[in-house]
Amino acid sequence: MSPLSGILVLDLTHVLAGPFASGTLSDLGARVIKVERPKTGDDTRAFPPFLDGESAYFAALNAGKQSIALDLHADADRTVFEALLARADVVLENYRPGVMERLGYGFDALHERFPRLIYGAVSGFGHTGPEAGKPAYDMVVQARGGVMSITGEEGGPPVRVGASIGDIIAGMYLT
């Protein structure tokens, strides 16, 4: 039996940090349902390279997960999502701060309705403070954190570390 067998995770994350975290939970035996936007899904579905028409990047981060397309602005889809929430143990999200609150699914609202639900969120600059609303792609985090100042050629411009270490570490901590 896997350590997280019987645990249901609703994964509203996208790109790398969040899907890395939910992928780890899936690897540990949780049932993970990835909730994606209709028509476009996770941005990484469009990231090359492609194998048999599918993004290898997306496939690697989302292996072992189930997927459902829901528009959380549409009443019918909200009803489906709320039925999933009633059964879920964990919900993960990595939207910019305030998005889940505007949808009516922020921590306070979910905690009131589903007090046993574990709510995990990751954002580049936190959920409060002067930079909370800024996007934080890995290159931005590497630059702001200073790691790019110690890479590359001496006397040359800063260079991004090849691996997306900021996103991977954020995903590890979200797990």
Where are these regions (language model features)?
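N-terminal helix-loop segment corresponding to the beta1-alpha1 unit
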Residues: M1-T175
